[in-house]
């Protein structure tokens, strides 16, 4: 995953010049786990098994509602952290307990 850190966010982007959150999950899961995911967040939220926030394990997908009809996805890294493509920060690591993310948490899925 480290090769992606610092990559700028670009809606619809799929390369190191700019990537969005769901494309980042496609790339990371393909490279790290040899697992093919669908391209969009709305498709990804249907994959795997729903799990509760308190049962998160490394590699679980975490979904957020970030606005009316807007969804965001990241991958859990353990110790309350997740890896994602942030609109404001690009590809970064954030904490689930930060108020912004805690209040927007939607659901989690185990796909590996």
Describe each model-derived feature in a short phrase.
Residues 61, 73-75:
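Conserved hydrophobic/aromatic beta-strand scaffold that supports enzyme active sites
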Residues 7-58:
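Catalytic cysteine-centered active-site loop
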Residues 59-60, 80:
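Structural motif
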Residues 3, 30-31, 75:
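Solvent-exposed polar/charged
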Residues 35, 70, 77-112:
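Aromatic- and glycine-rich peptidoglycan recognition patches
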């Amino acid at each position: 995953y480290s090769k992606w850190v610092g990559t700028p966010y670009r809606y619809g982007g799929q390369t190191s010049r700019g990537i969005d959150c769901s494309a980042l999950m496609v790339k990371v899961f393909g490279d790290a786990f040899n697992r093919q995911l669908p391209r969009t967040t709305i498709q990804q939220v249907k994959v795997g098994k729903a799990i509760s926030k308190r049962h998160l394990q490394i590699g679980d997908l975490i979904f957020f509602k970030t606005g009316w009809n807007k969804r965001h996805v990241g991958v859990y890294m353990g110790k309350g952290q997740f890896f994602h493509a942030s609109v404001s920060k690009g590809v970064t690591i954030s904490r689930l307990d930060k108020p912004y993310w805690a209040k927007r948490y939607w659901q989690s899925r185990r796909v590996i």
